[in-house]
Amino acid sequence: MLDTNPPAESQYKPTYADILAQLNDIQESLEIAIDKGYPTIKAEGVPDIRMSDKDYLEWALERINCLIYDVENIQEKLAQLLQINCDTNCEL
């Protein structure tokens, strides 16, 4: 389901499971659009939302860009942890 109220950026600490769930949401939305012949997204607690092609593409692009940002942040944190671990072990 599309999260229509995502947490504030400072509160959001994505996990790989979160990223996978978001990718599944995008995939489901694309499958629905293909099946129905028009762009539709699902949102919790409301009927399916029909969108114009342009709005739908903007929505999908925004979601994908957010996922890329999340993955880059996770990679950066892992690199920092690896560097800390290397620095600690190299000093011993």
Curated annotation (Swiss-Prot):
Superkingdom of the source species: Bacteria
Protein name: Uncharacterized protein PM1775
Organism: Pasteurella multocida (strain Pm70)
Lineage: Bacteria, Pseudomonadati, Pseudomonadota, Gammaproteobacteria, Pasteurellales
